[in-house]
């Protein structure tokens, strides 16, 4: 994908134009690899977590705020959770999964390296805040204490609000189409939650969700993610400058032809 993206980008270099400081609006989509960081809980932090790929997508706005800086706020759908297997002290084999859907508001800042107008690597850092929508927790285990149960996530077993930070790298390009262009961005970002995702009810004992039966809740459970996304945007003022330039040239040619026709 990156090779194809680069070929399209460099193909545009033969028709260079000044970089327009134009706001763009578009769609962003890709995949996310969610997991959990168990902090101050040595037992859980040592358990392996399965590699899980989930879809993610949303809307973004690309707002240039300087020669090499872009503010790119976005609203995204993303899934967070974990998938782990371990052996209980009783000898039972336990499989525990949690996958919850969120809607995020993110405020990334992109710092571009202007290699050319049509191929610009960038670094991105930013903040994100999200709200839990829905999801499920599933646990199954073998004898001698066999069980297989699935419950919905809620206030009793998963915090409602998510807040975190993100950082990553990417490349951006402009693909000219007539008098306008399409903005393309390919990015890979790491996401780190900063708020504990354990619900207060399950930590203070006022609720007894499936989590309590799976393990002793201590420390903090912080969501993490690794996203790879493609963004496609269109300018909100497409081709206005080119239209003015074309109108001016047309007037010049008409006046020039009239002068030759009438001799002045």
Regions found by a protein language model. Name each.
Residues 11-12, 59, 106-112, 166-173, ...:
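Short, well-ordered amphipathic alpha-helices
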Residues 35-52, 79-102, 130-162, 196-206, ...:
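Extracellular/periplasm-exposed beta-strand and loop segments of Gram-negative cell-envelope proteins
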Residues 120, 157-162, 167, 172-264:
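Predominantly the C-terminal beta-signal and adjacent terminal strand-loop region
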Residues 2-10:
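Hydrophobic h-region of N-terminal signal peptides that target proteins for export
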Residues 23-29, 71-73, 103-105, 121-129, ...:
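Transmembrane beta-strands of outer-membrane beta-barrel proteins
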Residues 69, 76-82, 100, 112-122, ...:
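Acidic/histidine-enriched, beta-strand-rich ligand/metal-binding domains
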Residues 10-58, 233-239, 259-264:
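Short glycine/proline- and aromatic-enriched beta-strand/turn motifs that initiate or cap beta-hairpins
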Residues 19, 33, 63-67, 111-117, ...:
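Outer-membrane beta-barrel strand-turn architecture
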């Amino acid at each position: 994908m990156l090779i194809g993206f680069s070929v399209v980008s460099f193909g545009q270099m033969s028709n260079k134009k000044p970089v327009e400081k134009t706001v763009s609006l578009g769609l962003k989509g890709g995949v996310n690899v969610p997991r959990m960081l168990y902090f101050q809980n040595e037992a859980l932090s040592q358990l392996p977590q399965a590699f899980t790929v989930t879809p993610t997508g949303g809307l973004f706005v690309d707002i240039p705020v300087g020669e090499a800086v872009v503010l790119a706020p976005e609203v995204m759908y993303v899934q967070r959770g974990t998938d782990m297997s371990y052996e209980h002290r009783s000898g039972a084999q336990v499989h525990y999964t949690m996958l919850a859907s969120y809607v995020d508001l993110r405020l990334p800042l992109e710092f571009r390296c202007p290699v050319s107008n049509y191929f610009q690597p960038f670094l991105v850092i930013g903040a994100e805040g999200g709200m839990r929508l829905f999801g499920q927790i599933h646990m199954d285990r073998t004898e001698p204490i066999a069980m297989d149960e699935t419950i919905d996530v809620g206030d009793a077993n998963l915090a409602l609000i998510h807040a975190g930070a993100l950082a990553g790298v990417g490349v951006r390009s402009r693909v000219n189409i007539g008098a306008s262009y399409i903005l393309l961005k390919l990015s890979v970002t790491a996401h780190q939650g900063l708020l504990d995702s354990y619900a207060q009810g399950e930590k203070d004992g006022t609720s007894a969700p499936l989590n309590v039966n799976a393990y002793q809740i201590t420390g903090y459970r912080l969501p993490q993610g690794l996203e790879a996304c493609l963004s496609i945007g269109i300018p909100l003022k497409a081709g206005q400058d080119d239209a003015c330039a074309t109108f001016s040239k047309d007037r010049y040619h008409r006046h020039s032809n009239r002068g030759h026709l009438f001799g002045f």
